[in-house]
UniProtKB/Swiss-Prot annotation:
One of its GO terms (biological process) is cytoplasmic translation. This protein binds to the 23S rRNA, and is important in its secondary structure. It is located near the subunit interface in the base of the L7/L12 stalk, and near the tRNA binding site of the peptidyltransferase center. It comes from Thermobifida fusca (strain YX). This is Large ribosomal subunit protein uL6. It holds the Pfam family Ribosomal_L6. The gene is rplF. Keywords: Ribonucleoprotein, Ribosomal protein, RNA-binding, rRNA-binding. NCBIfam families: L6_bact. One of its GO terms (cellular component) is cytosolic large ribosomal subunit. InterPro entries: Ribosomal_uL6-like (IPR000702), Ribosomal_uL6-like_a/b-dom_sf (IPR036789), Ribosomal_uL6_a/b-dom (IPR020040), Ribosomal_uL6_bac-type (IPR019906), Ribosomal_uL6_CS (IPR002358). The keyword tRNA processing does not apply. Belongs to the universal ribosomal protein uL6 family. PANTHER family: 60S/50S RIBOSOMAL PROTEIN L6/L9, LARGE RIBOSOMAL SUBUNIT PROTEIN UL6M. Part of the 50S ribosomal subunit. One of its GO terms (molecular function) is rRNA binding.
Length: 178
């Protein structure tokens, strides 16, 4: 059995898990999320814990077992605590500012770049060089943060651009002089 898949997921107070056929709905203080479970995986709710089991031992089913358990755990954590990705902007003249719900980036291009948040995502600008992407869906938060990072990836020579907080940029040596 999958080591991750066999671990039960404890449901914290204030979070309600509903299993309706192959749909798992999680409702918490921050919002509501839903996940459809693959046909070969079964999800049960027993005394405050969600348990994930599989029907057979085929390789595909075995891989889906641990994945499903992790996805449901992410739903529970997202609806109770939420997720945040922090991005740092470094470089001369590189900055971000909030314009209502949208973000306006100055990244050395001839024009400012405006980014609209998708549904369920909020932006928080702490400083002109520090941005927080927040939401309850872990996948969506990570995808939006990756899309923002791709606007100006960190340069390996000067390390300027948008990077995740704590991300180490592998620096390259410049051209060797004479």
């Amino acid at each position: 059995m999958s080591r991750i898949g066999r671990q039960p997921i404890s449901v914290p107070k204030g979070v309600e898990v509903t299993i309706d056929g192959k749909d798992v709905k999680v409702k918490g203080p921050k919002g509501e999320l839903k996940h459809t479970v693959p046909p070969s995986i079964t999800v049960t709710l027993e005394d405050g814990q969600v348990k994930v089991s599989r029907a057979d031992d085929r390789p595909q089913t075995r891989s889906l077992h641990g994945l499903t358990r992790s996805l449901i755990a992410n739903l529970i954590e997202g609806t109770s605590k939420g997720y945040t990705k922090t991005l740092e902007i470094s470089g001369v003249g590189y900055r971000v500012q909030a314009k209502g719900r949208n973000l306006e980036f100055s990244l050395g291009y001839s024009h400012p770049i405006v980014v609209e948040p998708p549904e369920g995502i909020t932006f928080r600008v702490e400083k002109p060089t520090l941005l927080h992407v927040e939401g309850i869906d872990k996948q969506k938060v990570g995808q939006v943060a990756a899309d923002i990072r791709s606007l100006r990836k960190p340069d390996p020579y000067k390390a300027k651009g948008i990077r995740y907080q704590g991300e180490r940029i592998r620096r390259k040596a410049g051209k060797a002089g004479k």
